Structures are given as structure tokens and as C-alpha cells.
């Protein structure tokens, strides 16, 4: 297991359950799942049928803990590729990682609704914002007209 390493001048260590801040939301998840690890998830993120995993790493900065999230893709021989960084220097002590089908879901704070969902884009060989095209969670279209170009009412979500 990858416990500690240096990348781009930063000394990072694997985030542990004890790096999570205590909260009612976290206790509720522990009650539901029994064994709950907020900073490690596994699944098939690239659709190749091989197990992949995402792991948060911790950097101890002057202002506290900063989390970096990496995905490790599985290989044909049962090992994993080098880390592919998805999120850098985020606050995650009150949040967690999850996988929803083939999406990596990063929730910075369990008590708040906003999440960031990342989809692997094989053609670009990188993770992209899964909600960017759909506009999910955006408020920049509030000034848009109430009708679409074909004169049908716009559905407000």
C-alpha cells in the first residue's frame, strides 16, 4: 500500500479515518455501513472491467490539513498504475469520496449538498467535470429566457 510519498515537492500521506472531523453525518454513515472509510473507494471507473480505486492523501499545511484525491487504474496483471490526480488541495475533513456507477463523487462537506462528480474521459485521458455539460448545480442560467427556441416552456430544476 502507498502510505507516504513526495510529489511536486509536497510530502503526502494516505488519509486515514482519523483525519475525518467528527460530525453527526459521519456517525450516521458509520451506523449504516458499520465499516466506513471516507477517504478510500473502489470500483471500475474507466469501464474496462478491472478494479480501480480512489484514495485521498493528506498534506499538513500551515493552515491545517489539505487533501489531494488520486485515482489508481487497475492493470491486466492485477497491479495499479501510477496515481492520476483528480482534486488538489481541497478541504475534505468533513466530507468523503464515493463512486456512483462510473463516476467519482467528491463531497467536501457531508452536511452540505454540493458535490463534485468526475467522469473518466478516455479520449482525453483525464477526468472531466461530469456536470459541466448538463449544467447541473449551476445558477448561471437564471437569467435565461423561460422558453426554449422552439417556444416550449423551460423546465426549471
Predicted regions and their residues:
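Acidic, small-residue rich beta-repeat scaffolds with periodic aromatic anchors
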Residues: 1-11, 79, 89-157
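Terminal domain-start segments
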Residues: 1-38
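Short consensus segments that form the blades of beta-propeller domains
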Residues: 29-31, 58-63
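Acidic, divalent-cation-chelating loop motifs in proteins
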Residues: 40-48
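Acidic/hydrophobic-patterned starts of short beta strands in beta-sheet-rich repeat architectures
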Residues: 47-57, 101-107
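Structural motif
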Residues: 62-70, 113-116
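Surface-exposed loop/edge segments in extracytoplasmic proteins
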Residues: 78-84
Amino acid at each position: 500500500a502507498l502510505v507516504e510519498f513526495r510529489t511536486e515537492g509536497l510530502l503526502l500521506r494516505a488519509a486515514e479515518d482519523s483525519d475525518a472531523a467528527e460530525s453527526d453525518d459521519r456517525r450516521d454513515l458509520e451506523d449504516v455501513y458499520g465499516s466506513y472509510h471516507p477517504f478510500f473507494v473502489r470500483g471500475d471507473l474507466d469501464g474496462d472491467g478491472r478494479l480501480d480505486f480512489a484514495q485521498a492523501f493528506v498534506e499538513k499545511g500551515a493552515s491545517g490539513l489539505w487533501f489531494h484525491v488520486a485515482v489508481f487504474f487497475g492493470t491486466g496483471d492485477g497491479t495499479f498504475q501510477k496515481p492520476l490526480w483528480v482534486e488538489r488541495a481541497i478541504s475534505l475533513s468533513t466530507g468523503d469520496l464515493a463512486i456512483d456507477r462510473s463516476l467519482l463523487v467528491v463531497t467536501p462537506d457531508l452536511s452540505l449538498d454540493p458535490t463534485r462528480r468526475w467522469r473518466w474521459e478516455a479520449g482525453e485521458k483525464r477526468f472531466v467535470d461530469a456536470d459541466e455539460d448538463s449544467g447541473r448545480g449551476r445558477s448561471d442560467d437564471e437569467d435565461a429566457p423561460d422558453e426554449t427556441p422552439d417556444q416550449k416552456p423551460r423546465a426549471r430544476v
